[in-house]
């Protein structure tokens, strides 16, 4: 696996994708947002979701109706009207970070859009460093799908630097039982694609399900780290002790993740 040269340029375009659901894509997006905001940089976040999930889009993020986009892709004019805000964020902004957060399982639509728009070329032309973060857990199907997504990204968006995100939600990636489906998927599918990536990001497990009550309450990572415990307890409905314990778990997780992000995206 190669290491991508770091850059102090604050103009980053970040595509975040997982081929399926419950892989950790949203947590990855929140971690990148927290990293940027801790440095005083406010990212522009576009979130692809179905109409049914529109209400889950956090305040301040731009909702893009993926249902309408599927229907519009065959018509260049229709697709442009839906996706134009993303292009404007790239062409009109200075010193910004633009995050594209795809809903899980949108591989075909994502690939079609990159092919039709050649958006990675626009990103490069406007002086942005382009990234594609592909998220996987250590389950066999997830690793196989992530490997395919990395391969597809290399074909449809060649100018984006690929990052493999290893989410340890169900365990690590270093001790699979010999002969297991996971061992085969890791060795035969994921490792060859990982070797072609610019970098890797590892998300350890957040102990004691510490993130779940905060996520359900709509809190950001920086909210959890910076708000008084009493306020966290009031917002989430947790007891003071449980709120403090959950925050400790999130803080320990962030202490491992944030240095990785700073090496990868040195925005401070």
Residues of each region from the PLM?
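Pre-Walker A adenine-sensing motif
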Residues: 1-7
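Conserved catalytic-core segment of NTP-binding enzymes
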Residues: 108-205, 211
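Switch I (G2) and immediately adjacent beta-strands of P-loop GTPase domains
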Residues: 58-63, 86-101
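P-loop NTP-binding site
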Residues: 12, 19, 163-168, 179-268
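Switch II (G3) loop of P-loop NTPases
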Residues: 96-114
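A short acidic, often aromatic-flanked loop/helix-cap motif at beta-alpha or helix-coil junctions
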Residues: 68-78, 171-173, 205-213
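Walker A/P-loop NTP-binding active-site region of P-loop NTPases
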Residues: 9-79
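Generic beta-sheet signal
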Residues: 15-17, 43, 96-100, 130, ...
């Amino acid at each position: 696996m190669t290491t991508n040269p770091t850059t102090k340029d604050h103009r980053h375009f970040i595509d975040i994708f997982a081929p399926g659901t419950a892989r950790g894509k949203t947590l990855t997006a929140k971690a990148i947002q927290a990293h940027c905001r801790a440095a005083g940089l406010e990212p522009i976040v576009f979130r692809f979701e179905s109409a049914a999930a529109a209400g889950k889009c956090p305040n301040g993020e731009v909702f893009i109706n993926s249902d309408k986009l599927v229907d519009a892709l065959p018509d260049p004019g229709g697709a442009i009207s839906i996706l134009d805000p993303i292009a404007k964020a790239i062409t009109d902004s200075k010193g910004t970070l633009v995050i594209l957060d795809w809903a899980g399982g949108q591989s075909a639509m994502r690939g079609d859009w990159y092919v039709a728009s050649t958006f990675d070329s626009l990103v490069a032309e406007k002086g942005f460093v382009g990234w594609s973060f592909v998220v996987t857990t250590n389950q066999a199907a997830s690793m196989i799908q992530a490997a395919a997504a990395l391969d597809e990204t290399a074909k449809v968006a060649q100018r984006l630097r690929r990052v493999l995100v290893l989410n340890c939600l169900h365990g690590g990636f270093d001790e699979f039982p010999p002969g297991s489906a996971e061992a085969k998927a890791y060795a035969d599918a994921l490792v060859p694609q990982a070797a072609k990536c610019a970098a890797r990001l590892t998300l350890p497990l957040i102990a004691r399900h510490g993130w779940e009550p905060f996520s359900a309450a709509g809190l950001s990572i920086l909210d959890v780290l910076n708000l008084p415990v009493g306020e966290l307890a009031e917002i989430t409905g947790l007891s003071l002790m449980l709120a403090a314990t959950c925050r400790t778990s999130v803080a320990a997780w962030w202490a491992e993740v944030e240095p990785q992000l700073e090496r990868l995206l040195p925005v401070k």
